[in-house]
A protein has these predicted regions:
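N-terminal targeting leaders
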Residues: 2-178
Length: 178
């Protein structure tokens, strides 16, 4: 009788803990969606910035790169105000000022968004391909529809005076499976 009672108590405790964990996961998912909206509606975010956020138990970690220091501060403040956020840890880096990098950003963005295959992205309020340039090294980040678009974007970003190109673009299918 005691064994059955302790097994039942253990099962009840495990169910309670797992449902609490499940509820916290759901809150974190909802919070991540709210944070995503807050980031994408930040008017000063451009295709030359890339911000990512992770959420665990209401604690938000911001990562990525921005072109100006005030953007880092603004984003931290915006995320802190999102309902449900307990704390924010910012690991956002500010890209160094460089005329060479600025010119390279313009060349790469014209090459990609000037290509007819990417015109549908170019007209979006927040185009999905982000072009991060640091010290002549180009990183493509964001989401595209297919692997063909990912390969084309990388090809278009090559041969414009860059030292290297890192293609961190993901397809819609890859993002959905995460």
């Amino acid at each position: 009788m005691k064994v059955k009672a302790s097994i039942a108590a253990t099962v009840a405790l495990l169910v309670a803990l797992s449902s609490t964990a499940f509820a916290q996961d759901r809150r974190d998912i909802r919070l991540a969606e709210d944070i995503g909206r807050s980031i994408t509606t930040y008017a000063r975010l451009t295709i030359f910035d890339d911000i990512n956020a992770t959420v665990e138990n209401g604690v938000v970690v911001l990562t990525g790169r921005v072109t100006m220091p005030y953007k880092k501060d603004d984003l931290e403040k915006r995320i802190t105000k999102v309902d449900g956020v307990r704390s924010v840890r910012s690991e956002i880096g500010v890209l160094p000022v460089s005329q060479f990098d600025d010119e390279l950003r313009r060349r790469v963005s014209r090459a990609i968004y000037g290509n007819p295959s990417f015109w549908n992205y170019a007209v979006m309020a927040n185009p999905p391909i982000h072009i991060i340039v640091e010290g002549g090294h180009v990183t493509l980040a964001g989401v595209v529809n297919s692997n063909v678009e990912r390969m084309l974007a990388r090809s278009l970003a090559t041969g414009l005076g860059e030292l290297s190109v890192t293609n961190s673009l993901k397809t819609d299918a890859e993002v959905k499976s995460e």
